[in-house]
Amino acid sequence: MAADVEGDVYVLVEHPFEYTGKDGRRIAIQPNERYRLLRRSTEHWWHVRREPGGRPFYLPAQYVRELPALGDPAPAPQPSVPQQRPAVPEPLAYDYRFVSTPVGADGSSAEPRGRASSLCGPARQRTGGQRNSLAPGGPACLYVRPAAPVRPAQSLDDLARGGTAPPAGLLGSAGHFKASSVAGSWVCPRPLAPSDSENVYEAIPDLRCPPRAESPKQVDDPPEPVYANVERQPRATSPRSAAAPPRLSPVWETHTDTGTGRPYYYNPDTGVTTWESPFETPEGTTSPATSRASVGSGESLETEWGQYWDEESRRVFFYNPLTGETAWEDETEELEEDHQEQLEMQPSLSPRSPGQQRPPTPETDYPELLASYPEEDYSPVGSFSDPGPASPLVAPPGWSCQITPDKQMLYTNQFTQEQWVRLEDQHGKPYFYNPEDSSVQWELPQVPIPAPRSVRKSSQDSDTPAQASPPEEKIKTLDKAGVLHRTKTVDKGKRLRKKHWSTSWTVLEGGVLTFFKDSKTSAAGGLRQPSKLSTPEYTVELKGASLSWAPKDKSSKKNVLELRSRDGSEYLIQHDSEAIISTWHKAIAEGISELSADLLQGEEGEPSSADFGSSERLGSWREEDVRQNAASPSLSPGGLESDLSRVRHKLRKFLQRRPTLQSLRDKGYIKDQVFGCALAQLCERERSPVPRFVQQCIRTVEARGLDIDGLYRISGNLATIQKLRYKVDHDERLDLDDGRWEDVHVITGALKLFFRELPEPLFPFSHFHQFIAAIKLQDPAQRSRCVRDLVRTLPAPNQDTLRLLIQHLCRVIEHGEQNRMTVQNVAIVFGPTLLRPEMEEASMPMTMVFQNQVVELILHQCADIFPPH
C-alpha cells in the first residue's frame, strides 16, 4: 500500500538495475547512487527522483537502502524521581566513539587475551530480518552481557595528550555518537543466553596495553570499531548485596486493582496480567517486581534499560548500564509483534468466573501514569476500554452461556436457539462468531424483550403526554463478507458508457454494502481483522434501494444481481457459484426490507425542528385528516383546505430561507468545476485566455517527449483519468509530475476528455454547418480562405485555445516518424471532439468525414490561419 514520505528522505543504490518504462525511457541505476524518495508506492517499487530537478521514476525497493532522515529529535522530558525512594547511583552517561583496535608491529591485535572476542562477530540469528549493527550499513555487531561490570575509562582527549592517538575507525576519524539516558522510558529486551557471545565492550586502558607477542595473528581485514566507555559523571557504585533475592525472568510487576483492591501481576514484556502469583517466593522473602518507570530500586537496576539517542545513525537504542547489553528499538518492537502473533494464534478462551477476570493493565489501573509510559513498552492486551459485560459468563438478557468441550464460550439465544461463539482478536477485544453463516460482530444481537406499548393520545382525549420510548441503539453488525464481481452501470442517474467488471472484497455491514479496491490482502484477513481492509471504492446505502435479478439485456453473465440505490445509481453483482450469489441475494434483500420498514416509520413520524425550523408537525397530514373525518363525520369541510394552506405557508418560508447559490460559492461550499464548465466562463474565472489545465497538459506532454508511440491515439487507464479529473475539479494545486500521472497517455486522455466534456465544443454549435459547407467547396483556395475566416470569427477564448492546441498538434506531427501520428491520424482523433452538431443527424458517418477534413485542413494551414504574433 502506498505511503507518503515526510521530510527529505534519500535512498542509496546497492545493486545495479536497468529497465525500460512505459513511456520508452531507459532507466538505469548504479551502486552508490543517491536519490530522493518521493513515495513508497508499493511493497516492491518506490518512486524517486534524482536531485535536483530530475524527472521522477520508479526503482525496485529491494535494490536500494533507505538512508537515515536528517533532523535532530527533541530530547525527551526527564521526569523527576520521587524523594521517598532510596537513593541509588544513577546510570552513567557515556560518550561512545568509534576507535580502532591498536595493531602491533607484527600485525597482531593489542586486545588482551582475557577479554578476547572481537566486537564484530557472527550475528546472532533472529526472525524477521532483524538488523544487528548499531550503525546502518555497518558490520553485524553483538551487544551482550559482559562477564564483569563495565569499568569507567579515560577519555579520548586524555589519550591524545598521552601521545597514543587511536587510529581511525571504520566510520572515519570523527565518527562518534553521544548516549543520553531518557528517564521514564525503560524497556527490558529478552536477555541473551551466555553462549550467544562474549563480552564486546573494551575499556580505554586495555587499548593502551602493549601487544602480546605470544598471540600472533595476521590482520587482513580493516580495523574493527571498538566502543569505549568514557565516564562523564563518575559516581561510586554500591556493590550488590549477596543476600538480595534473585531476579526472575521474565519480569513481573505487582499492581493493585482500584476496583477490587486485589493485587495482581503484570508482565511488561508480554503485556499479560494475572491474579495468580507467577513465581513462588521463599518464606520470609518478598521481592515484588517494581514498575518499569521506577529507577530507584537497586534490586531492579540490573534489569532496567535506558533509552539513548545515537547521533551517528539517528536512531534510538536501549542500553543496560550494569549488564552492558544494547538493543535497537525495533528489536523490542519485533518481540512484542511476535508475542502478539502468538496470542492471536492461541487465544485465551478459558472460562473465568466474575472473581477470576483478567485484571487490568497499568494503563487502565493507573491512567495518570500514561504520560510516562512509552507506547511500545507493553501490549494493551486485555486493556480495551469498550463497554462490555462484567464477565464473559454473564450473558445478556435473552441469552444463555455454556462452555463447550473445546473450552469455548457458546452463547445460545433463548428464543431462536441461535448460537454464537465468543472469541478474541489480536488486542484481546472479544467478538462473536456465528458458525452457521460465518458472520462476525462485536456484540451479541439484542433480543427484543416485550414491553408495554405506549398509546398515542390526542390532546382532545387526555392532557397527559404520551410516554416516548428511548430510541433503540442500532448495532453495526458484519452481516456478510466475501469476494464478488461487480460493475457500476449508472452513476446518479447518468448511464456510463462501458461496463468495467472487477473483482473486489465486498462487505455487508449495518445496512451498507461496501466494495473495496484491493481484494488480495482483504480476503485473507478481512473477517478476522476488519481494520486491515483497504480503501472503499463504492459504498451503497441499502435504505430505499431495490434488488432484482438482472435481465439478459443487462449482462450476458450468469447469476447477476441488479442493485439500484436511492441516489439513482445502479450496480451489477455477479458470482460464478449460484449458491453463493443466492445467499448474497437473501442477505441484501433482508437488509433492504428492514431498512425500508424503518424508512416508512420515519416518514410517518414527526420531522425534527432542524429540517423545517419549527417543531410543528408537517408530515402525514392526509392520514390524520382521514382518521379524524372517520371518527367525527361532522368535521367542517374547510379543515382540509386550512391544512393545505398551512403546509404551503411552511414550505414557502422554508424555501425563502434557503441561501442563494452565489452565497454558497462565496463561502466556499460550492466550487465550480473545470470539467464540464463553459470555456468562456472558465477563462473568465481563471483570468486567463486559455484554461490553465490545457496549458499544463500541453507543457507536460512536450516535456516528456513527442516521440512516444501512439501519442493521443492510445487510450490511458480510464480509472486513473477519472482520478485526475477529480483532482482537477476539487484541488487547485495540481502537479502533473506526480508519480500517479506518470503515464503520458493518462494526461493526453484527460486533455481529450476535457474537450469532450465542454457544454459547447471548441467550434461552437452556431458555426458547425458553416464549417461543413466550407469544407465541401471544390476550389482549394476558396475552401482554405473560407475556413480561415470562420476560425477568426470564433469567440476569443475559443480562438486562443484552438491556436494553442493546433500549434501543439503540429509539433506532434513533426515527430510522426517516431510516434506514427500523421495529419490524418490526428484529425481522426480530434475531429469529432472539436467539431460536432448540437443534435445528432441521420447522416452521422458522412458528417464525421467532414469533421475530420476540417481539422485536417486547419492543421495543414496552421501557419496561415494562426500567424505568429
UniProtKB/Swiss-Prot annotation:
Where Phosphoserine occurs, residue numbers? Answer: 155, 215, 249, 350, 459, 462, 469, 632, 636
What GO cellular-component annotations does this UniProt entry give? endosome; membrane
Q: Give the species this sequence originates from.
A: Mus musculus
What range(s) does the SH3 domain occupy? Answer: 6-69
Tissue specificity annotation: Widely expressed. Highly expressed in kidney, lung, small intestine and thymus.
Q: Where in the cell is it found?
A: Cytoplasm; Membrane
Domain WW, first and last residues per copy: 246-280, 299-333, 414-447
Give the Low complexity compositional bias ranges: 235-250
* Keyword Nucleotidyltransferase attached: no
Task: Indicate how the chain sits in the lipid bilayer.
Answer: Peripheral membrane protein
* Coiled-coil intervals, chain numbering: none
Q: List the disulfide bonds.
A: none
The site feature described as Arginine finger is recorded at: 713
Matches recorded under InterPro entries: PH-like_dom_sf, PH_domain, Quinoprotein_ADH-like_sf, Rho-GAP, Rho_GTPase_activation_prot, RhoGAP_dom, SH3-like_dom_sf, SH3_domain
> How does this polypeptide assemble, per the annotation?
Interacts with SH3KBP1/CIN85.
Quote the PANTHER family the UniProt record gives: RHO GTPASE-ACTIVATING PROTEIN 27 (PTHR23176:SF104), RHO/RAC/CDC GTPASE-ACTIVATING PROTEIN (PTHR23176)
One of the protein's GO biological processes:
protein heterooligomerization
Identify the SMART domains for this entry.
PH (SM00233), RhoGAP (SM00324), WW (SM00456)
Which Pfam families does the annotation name? PH, RhoGAP, WW
- Segments of skewed composition (Basic and acidic residues): 209-220
Function noted in UniProt: Rho GTPase-activating protein which may be involved in clathrin-mediated endocytosis. GTPase activators for the Rho-type GTPases act by converting them to an inactive GDP-bound state. Has activity toward CDC42 and RAC1.
Name assigned to this protein: Rho GTPase-activating protein 27
Transferase recorded as keyword? no
